[in-house]
Amino acid sequence: MGSNLPYAADAESPLKPAELQVLRAQYEKEGDYVGIQTKFNFAWGLIKSNARPDQQEGVRLLSEIFRAAPERRRECLYYLALGNYKLGNYGEARRYNDLLLEKEPANLQAASLGTLIDERVSKEGLMGFAIVGGLALAAGLVGGMVFRGAKRR
């Protein structure tokens, strides 16, 4: 991540395993009666993780909070956007981030994450074009060799 995007530092800074374990222990301790704040804290820690299964679980927990607690939706939006960004779900990431920016146009963290999302989409889009172009070139070369070989017979 570039140093020109300090507000999106959450995108690449996981918690230490011991810190995540504290959040997990509290979440598991509360069991069936887990509080919204405990669930949010654990989801936040999971999303910051570099492990894809943790990120997926974090997005799932935040989605539950988003649906069940309308008063907490705004604070879920950024981390839903971040989690989806880290999972490569750029359309979902952009959707959540845009919702947050509609509510808070001056939110520098969301603006910074929006830039990261746009950069990743552009980069992967260019890679996709390069792959398709390379395949087309290879098919053309093979086709040319087959055609040339057929002409010689």
From Swiss-Prot:
Transmembrane segments annotated in the record for this chain: 127-147
Topology of this chain in the membrane: Single-pass membrane protein
UniProt-listed GO biological process terms: autophagy of mitochondrion; mitochondrial fission; peroxisome fission
Keyword Nucleotide-binding (UniProt): no
Main location: mitochondrion
Localization: Mitochondrion outer membrane
Entry-linked CDD domains: Fis1
Cytoplasmic compartment segments: 1-126
Free-text comment about domains: The C-terminus is required for mitochondrial localization, while the N-terminus is necessary for mitochondrial fission.
Role description: Has a role in mitochondrial fission. Has a role in outer membrane fission but not matrix separation.
Protein's UniProt name: Mitochondrial fission 1 protein
